[in-house]
A protein has these predicted regions:
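Active-site neighborhoods and metal-handling regions in enzymes and metal-associated proteins
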Residues: 1-378
């Protein structure tokens, strides 16, 4: 269902098996719920619906995917290489019963994903050692395989199509519902999947929004508005592009917005120039903060984050936020989003610019084709 080859899925399973060994466990429970839980789809090929629990057994042929709703089981069986069974009333109870049926339960079991507390208690009540494998799993997602990069390129193309359609829909009288509908259709008509589409709308002359909103509210776009966006469409679960842009509606940017965007472009260029293997996250943070701070502005959104398989390291926070910059070194094959969200210090006006980039030995490679820069529409 995810479109990856058998060889790619086996590569992932072997890599995860090595993480089990490092964690001192022979098996693991990989959990996802409510369309979230990237490890389930990464290892099984099944996009999580209501709930899914993957039993990663000592031998790959013994892996079992437990799916919560009985009517979801048939498609899961058609889509996955692993055995699929109904999860029953409680997925962890079913998993422990299956493991016990093969002999006695192991003394230690690894866990990946946000396992609910009640199910954790069930597990901890029968297994003496419950091992958190989330950090190890995250490390497996940082450097992308050739097939993963290809999927991200496809996600980038779908995202470009969405932003192109969005830009065409931004005109006076259009609601944010209608604009986002146009963006969604552009990628769903090509088989793309939803990921995120955030939109910020405010008047350039009296700004009150500095970062895109996560939910549309029926806001009507007007002449001389400024629109910021953060759009991601996916080729497979967690394989999305990401484009952040700013548009002015029916008029050129005011002096303030022109300055904000010029600073954002300069910050983007400074960070992108440093995207080479061996660069530390602290160096990326310093490059962005120097440009933004010297201009007298700040930011709200994270400046940089890993992407493709989750919201990954390095997550570099906006200037002034009480969050330490991680001690992290870039490696070729990582994919990151550079996204300086430059805003005024009063938080009333802001711009977005940025996109998903591939770290290579030669420097950053663009995966997107949508033009950079502040654009006028409508």
């Amino acid at each position: 269902m995810t479109g990856f080859s058998i060889a790619e899925m086996r590569r992932r399973r072997a890599a995860f098996g090595r993480e089990l060994e490092r964690g001192g466990v022979s098996c693991a429970l990989v959990y996802g719920a409510n369309r979230s839980g990237s490890a389930v789809s990464w290892l099984s090929g099944w996009p999580v619906t209501r709930e899914a629990l993957l039993i990663v057994a000592p031998e790959e042929d013994d892996d079992v995917l437990l799916v919560s709703y009985f009517n979801h089981v048939p498609q899961a069986r058609r889509s996955c290489a692993v055995r699929v069974e109904w999860a029953g009333g409680r997925a962890v109870t079913t998993a422990l019963d299956l493991l016990a049926a093969r002999g006695r339960l192991p003394e230690r079991i690894g866990v990946v994903g946000a396992l609910p507390f009640d199910q954790y208690l069930l597990l901890a009540g029968q297994v003496s050692g419950v091992v958190n494998l989330n950090p190890g799993y995250t490390s497996l997602r940082l450097v992308k395989s050739a097939e993963e990069v290809a999927a991200l390129r496809r996600g980038a193309a779908l995202t470009d199509a969405a932003v192109t359609a969005l830009a065409g829909a931004l005109s006076p009288g259009t609601t944010d519902y209608q604009a986002l509908s146009a963006a969604e259709y552009a990628y769903t008509a090509q088989g793309g999947l939803h990921h995120i589409h955030y939109l910020g709308i405010t008047a350039m002359d009296e700004p009150a929004v500095s970062v895109p909103a996560q939910w549309p509210t029926g806001l009507v776009i007007r002449h001389r508005d400024v629109v910021t966006c953060e759009i991601s469409a996916a080729a497979a679960p967690e394989y999305a592009g990401q484009v952040l842009r700013t548009f002015t509606v029916g008029a050129p940017p005011t002096a303030l917005y022109a300055e904000l965007h010029a600073v954002a472009d300069a910050a983007y260029d400074a960070v992108a120039a440093a995207l080479v293997p061996g660069t530390r996250a602290s160096d990326l943070a310093a490059a962005a903060v120097a440009v933004i701070g010297q201009a007298g502005f700040t930011a709200i959104d994270d400046l940089v984050h890993g992407f493709g398989g989750g919201y990954l390291p390095p997550v570099i926070p906006a200037p002034g936020r009480r969050m330490a910059t991680p001690d992290f070194i870039l490696t070729a094959g990582m994919t990151v989003v550079v996204q300086p969200n430059v805003v005024t210090r009063d938080g009333r006006a802001g711009v977005q610019t940025g996109e998903l980039l591939l770290v290579t030995e030669r420097g950053p490679e663009r995966l997107h084709t949508f033009p950079r820069g502040l654009q006028r529409v409508g």
